[in-house]
């Protein structure tokens, strides 16, 4: 089957906001973007809340965005599924969760609960900790240790005190549990193979090994702030009562990992579940009774899963592959899982005719130190792919607006936008020269808001702002006044001249004149 070649460019974290103040996108010098916006059909679409399968008031994120874009329909997120399970009561009868609780209770062992403690809603939610404490109390389990990872990335940089206080109140109300350790997500939730970061979290969890200790979580947080650390970067801290010892994981204990987003939970899970793990030396390898994850983190993991993924049939990648067409996914490390695993509806393997290019992200502590990231390298690979004329569909992600936006550094974020703009001009020109068309969009907002006016702190989280869509091609066309991320794949199919599969509920934003 013949199809017009199309290029989808996803500008990660590129939201729309009119005010220039603290807006890296508005303040950046971006002649290519400005020209494309002025001279080509464009619109704004929704990328948060119910339009992408999230609860009301919940900002979008990269996982959710790419799932919805690739599926061509609203994908109800694990966050929403879990919240509904708590409301319906199913959470408290979930077989995987009950198994972990009962194994600990019936054998006099400890249940260790791991996860990101915040209300950010991107990787986890504090209310899931609270619900699990209720479950443990209902089932008569007395030994529950909470190992909390601090956020400061999808939440304000110094907001952990609120979540720790609410958790402490819940512990008192439920009558079970105590905080045994805490560490920043920078260490516990690395996804870029910085294994020494992960080792510090693993050693803390398994043997209570930590650079710092405190009598309470609140005291540990105050000490971290005094050292100049913000939530994301809090170093391993064991919470040890005056008359006690650090908590360790023992043979026969159970673990429940409460993160519902997989990409930043995989690396820390591996040393617990892989017998031949070799990325770092493990001083202790407790033989756990069960390792339960709230959602499916990887098809390769032999673990218990409380909420397994739901199959997404006939997403864009699968549909294009079944038509015998060629496609390419390209991104740097930070967003590679999003244009592959998440875009494909949670499928680990590539579809027939699907090629993938991974460009390594720079090895820096934070991306404000190198706001260009690997955008230029991605662009060179992308230009070569366009020039090869092999592909009917190319999906490319530029990570800069999101990853540099997360640092809260306005000047660096402006540089990130300007870098992407330079790349955008080159690849759009190349795709048009090839006789193809381009659709540019974003998965959620971020870089358009770099300061929280209420708190005066850097704004490092995503936003709920609308995201842009630009159609660039030689045909005359118009775009709908609004829509949502589910409409992106139907729009691409319209551009390619292909029918839309019945499983896609989104609608094409594009009308050719």
From Swiss-Prot:
Binding positions for Mn(2+) 2 per the UniProt entry: 12, 62, 443-444
Molecular function GO terms recorded: manganese ion binding; phosphoglycerate mutase activity
A GO BP annotation: glucose catabolic process
Reactions catalysed according to its record: (2R)-2-phosphoglycerate = (2R)-3-phosphoglycerate
Keyword annotations of the record: Glycolysis, Isomerase, Manganese, Metal-binding
Listed InterPro entries: Alkaline_phosphatase_core_sf (IPR017850), BPG-indep_PGM_N (IPR011258), Metalloenzyme (IPR006124), PGAM_B_sf (IPR036646), Pgm_bpd_ind (IPR005995)
UniProt cofactor(s): Mn(2+)
Top EC class, one word: isomerase
Residues forming the catalytic site: 62
Annotated pathway: Carbohydrate degradation; glycolysis; pyruvate from D-glyceraldehyde 3-phosphate: step 3/5
Entry's EC annotation: 5.4.2.12
Binding residues for substrate: 123, 153-154, 185, 191, 261-264, 335
Domain of life (superkingdom): Bacteria
PANTHER family referenced in this protein's UniProt entry, alphabetically: 2,3-BISPHOSPHOGLYCERATE-INDEPENDENT PHOSPHOGLYCERATE MUTASE (PTHR31637:SF0)
Family designation: Belongs to the BPG-independent phosphoglycerate mutase family.
Function of the protein: Catalyzes the interconversion of 2-phosphoglycerate and 3-phosphoglycerate.
Protein name: 2,3-bisphosphoglycerate-independent phosphoglycerate mutase
Organism: Thiobacillus denitrificans (strain ATCC 25259 / T1)
Gene field: gpmI
